[in-house]
Amino acid sequence: MLAIVVSRADEASEHIGRKLRSLADWTEHEDERRADGAGGGTYYRTDRAELRIFDDLHIHLDGAASAFEEPDLLVFASRHSGDTGPLLTAHATGNFGPAEYGGGDGSLARAAPNALSAVRDAFETHAPDDYDVGIECTHHGPSTVGCSSLFVELGSGPDQWQDSEGAAAVARSILSLRGVEPHTERTVVGFGGGHYAPRFDRVLTDTDWGVGHVAADWSLTELGDPRDSRAVIAKAFQASGTEFALVDGDRPELEAVIEDLGFEVLSETFLQETTGVPLSLVGRLEDDCGPIDDGLRLGEPATGYDGEFVTEELPDELLDEANGVDRTAVREAADAVALAYGTADGGSLAVGPVALAAADDYRSLVESLAAVLDTKYDSVEIEASTVIAHREAFDPELARDAGVDEGPAFGKLSSGASVDVDGETVTPDDVHRVRERRFEF
């Protein structure tokens, strides 16, 4: 069940609350066990959601989940304040350092990484044209909610808090979270970067990974030496429900502490490459073909695949020749056929090995590499285990045999023009020879 908290101390929250009640069929109920200002009194229910109203600002509502009956996810409908113009934003709550705005020092609420990703997608669908959308770092209370939670905010000033379209967009985005699982196995804790977490926002928009707690640069400054902040760093993973981190910037001391605590630092490349690919398959591919961070790339067939595979080396001469003709086409060929393939030069050059779902895919990939040669050779054919390429080219030896020595006439002939030698015409066809290259595989 989705729990929704509205605060009477927040005009944007009240506005969003009114929009929520207008956008769904709610039934009105009375809770006489709790004080009206603590979520009791009149409250509202609709399909898979319940809305309660509190007097205090959200940031001071520790334990808010206790007002609801076993919520899976709790959303604080809130204003956002800042110099950021029209903005819809969301984030997990708690404090990496001192609790200046609710919650406790070094205390983090249970994050909802999958719900954060879902509401970020909903923002894109529902936001008015003049609004930006995004996420923020973890930066205020409450830090003890009682279930997975996040703030969903309308900002960034009075004009937006009173904006009907903006409030409706937030309300629709909140309602879209009904039935959404709060957590996902594919989650990272974020460390570093600015308050509005552009790198971690990119993770949500460009990959299928979720983002839990985010400690921005200023939070890490408050923490000081990461060796002295091991407890709160560990809490960030526990409260995010993950063992993985993404670090923005060069922070070797922090990464050392993360790894010493038993967690793993991933790269953004890893998150992008593994999108849609079962992590169990990723692990096996890296074991056989090398790490993604060392150049392994995952092809289209890896999406959703978790079966067996074979590993093969590509024929060196054919691969070198094809890369020399069009390395982009070679990458595209490998991407279309292979589960995974090795690369060099920052991922731009396919070099092998390749992992294939079936042994027959090896020949398919060779055929694709042979097709790349078509732009350089006059004909390319495959016989048994050999790619045979033919190309008609100017032969200097034939030109000299025809009496054309080095000089202007030689240059004209090599460029495709006929020349006269002692009253005889020598044509380009006279001095061209078909050359053959054979590539074994």
From Swiss-Prot:
Coiled coil: none
Keyword Hydrolase: yes
Enzyme class, first EC level, given as a word: hydrolase
Catalytic activity, reaction form: a D-aminoacyl-tRNA + H2O = a tRNA + a D-alpha-amino acid + H(+); glycyl-tRNA(Ala) + H2O = tRNA(Ala) + glycine + H(+)
SUPFAM superfamilies xrefs: AF0625-like
Enzyme Commission (EC) number: 3.1.1.96
Pfam families for this protein: tRNA_deacylase (PF04414)
GO terms classed as biological process: D-amino acid catabolic process
Keywords: Hydrolase, Metal-binding, Zinc
Domain of life: Archaea
Keyword Hydrolase: yes
Cross-referenced NCBIfam families: PRK14866.1-1
Family: Belongs to the DtdA deacylase family.
Subunit structure: Monomer.
Name this protein carries in UniProt: D-aminoacyl-tRNA deacylase
